[in-house]
């Protein structure tokens, strides 16, 4: 079994049922870390609210959800303070508190998402609140 699984290299969470199945899979396979980026803030927030109302943990520890921001005009509704992934547009400067995705600054393109997983950094480090991606 893989130790890390990334959902949606291209795509997003479809609906609440789909997201609940993502949660169930993470609960059923605790030895694997699952992660995704999403712009489906309402779906995620609604499911978290329902889970909290049912006295359940908001999300399994092995399911990492990163809300995708897209500049000043597209801000995530983030009442549960989930971590975020933000675009740094050309000509803009990355805020110092944001972590730059290592894959984007690796000139030889040898660094991959799994490397961050293996090193416990980037998207897999809960202390890092915002991941920066350069516009491409």
Predicted regions and their residues:
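Class I S-adenosyl-L-methionine
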Residues: 1-136
């Amino acid at each position: 079994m893989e130790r890390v699984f990334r959902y949606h290299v291209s795509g997003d969470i479809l609906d609440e049922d789909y997201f609940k199945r993502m949660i169930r899979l993470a609960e059923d396979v605790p030895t694997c870390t699952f992660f995704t980026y999403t712009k489906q803030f309402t779906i995620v927030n609604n499911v978290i609210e329902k889970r909290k109302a049912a006295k359940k943990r908001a999300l399994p520890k092995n399911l990492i959800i990163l809300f995708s921001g897209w500049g000043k005009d597209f801000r995530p509704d983030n009442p549960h303070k989930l971590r975020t992934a933000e675009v740094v547009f050309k000509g803009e400067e990355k805020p110092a508190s944001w972590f730059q995705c290592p894959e984007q600054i690796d000139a030889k393109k040898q660094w991959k998402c799994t490397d961050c997983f293996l090193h416990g950094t980037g998207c897999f480090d809960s202390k890092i609140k915002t991941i920066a991606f350069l516009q491409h």
